[in-house]
Amino acid sequence: MKLITILLLCSRLLPSLAQEEGAQELNCNDETVFQAVDTALKKYNAELESGNQFVLYRVTEGTKKDGAETLYSFKYQIKEGNCSVQSGLTWQDCDFKDAEEAATGECTTTLGKKENKFSVATQICNITPGKGPKKTEEDLCVGCFQPIPMDSSDLKPVLKHAVEHFNNNTKHTHLFALREVKSAHSQVVAGMNYKIIYSIVQTNCSKEDFPSLREDCVPLPYGDHGECTGHTHVDIHNTIAGFSQSCDLYPGDDLFELLPKNCRGCPREIPVDSPELKEALGHSIAQLNAQHNHIFYFKIDTVKKATSQVVAGVIYVIEFIARETNCSKQSKTELTADCETKHLGQSLNCNANVYMRPWENKVVPTVRCQALDMMISRPPGFSPFRLVRVQETKEGTTRLLNSCEYKGRLSKARAGPAPDHQAEASTVTP
């Protein structure tokens, strides 16, 4: 009897002991659960070449691990929807396909998050086909989008146009270059339609100094990057007659890539206590106090990271923490050395970009800050999930899991009024 009790206890403890050290479990009411899984599922659907999109069914596991970069890990279940991958709809616009014919699957994904944007690092989905009839060659859609080689010469003018369109229609300070083509499809019409998914990366060429992308513009390992989906129509005269593009842009990630040696024009790290930063920091805090409507001045407390980049001048990129001082804007016209930080004053995490051309006495500072203690609050019941207890059996061991079931859509088999149920604050994992 004691042996049985010990075995039962171990079966409950093993899942939690196996959990990655330092990982924090997430609950269904945490808005990052939906944001992260939505990003992962949209990426999976975007990479499908044919068939229907998949719709989120439930999230069964979710953890967050803080470090130099915050990493999120999820396991979620999906079901085939009734919207094709070429429909232009998102998975949230689709309903579940009839249960008998629908494919199902489970995905395991890891995401990074920086400046409130998620990016998928890894993702594996195992799909179980439905019981519906299999498509034959005769069933293939004539005139529908078909996959084409990603290195096709037909794509070169289309991709060149896509990158030029991005550079000409965004407010980013630098030009971007093509990094990689991820998928490409074509459709025969009166001419040709192309749908291409591709990634772009920031170069060292600023728009102020370079009117267009050149061959000597170098992609920056520290630079911003993005993923785009472009739709292009090439008419019968082989002219681009229509184009649309949507891009998700992510801030640069310098955690895993080192700068190449002898990279002219690339940013270089400089010590946070370097005298070289003194002038740039002065412009940064002056800009912060000018644009911030707080009644007290802020001063720089800690410099966390800094880089400089030689262009037509110098660009300093600095991350620092600013703290509220005891000097009010009513009593002083500017921040002075005798202003002291308040012990319980507000703290800001700031990112500054300071462009300096000393021979012209030109300084262009840009500062973005966020309160360190800023918390996003939501009304109760806003979560798109409801808590569901799910029984799982693996290798002879049965356990109950708290899963977050998506309540945005109902399959036809479960059609009817949605229950008036508020998501409970419970963790996703056991």
Curated annotation (Swiss-Prot):
Question: Where in this chain does the record put each Cystatin kininogen-type domain?
Answer: 28-131, 150-253, 272-375
User: Which residues are reported to carry the modification Pyrrolidone carboxylic acid?
Assistant: 19
- The main location is secreted
One Pfam match, given by its short name, reads Cystatin
Question: What's noted about post-translational modification?
Answer: As T-kinin is preceded by a Met instead of an Arg or Lys, it is not released from its precursor by either tissue or plasma kallikrein.
**Annotated SUPFAM superfamilies:** Cystatin/monellin
Task: Describe, from its UniProt entry, the tissues in which this protein is expressed.
Answer: Plasma.
List the induction conditions.
Answer: In response to an inflammatory stimulant. T-kininogen II synthesis is induced and the plasma concentration of T-kininogen I is raised.
Extract the InterPro entries matched here: Cystatin_dom, Cystatin_sf, Kininogen-type_cystatin_dom, Kininogen_Fetuin_HRG, Prot_inh_cystat_CS
GO molecular-function terms, A-Z: cysteine-type endopeptidase inhibitor activity
Q: Which Gene3D superfamilies match?
A: 3.10.450.10
Its Gene Ontology biological processes?
Answer: acute-phase response; negative regulation of blood coagulation; negative regulation of cell adhesion; vasodilation
The record's keywords, sorted A to Z, are: Acute phase, Disulfide bond, Glycoprotein, Protease inhibitor, Pyrrolidone carboxylic acid, Repeat, Secreted, Signal, Thiol protease inhibitor, Vasoactive, Vasodilator
Q: Quote additional remarks.
A: Rats express four types of kininogens: the classical HMW and LMW kininogens produced by alternative splicing of the same gene, and two additional LMW-like kininogens: T-I and T-II.
Q: This protein is called what? A: T-kininogen 1
Q: What is the lineage of its organism?
A: Eukaryota, Metazoa, Chordata, Craniata, Vertebrata
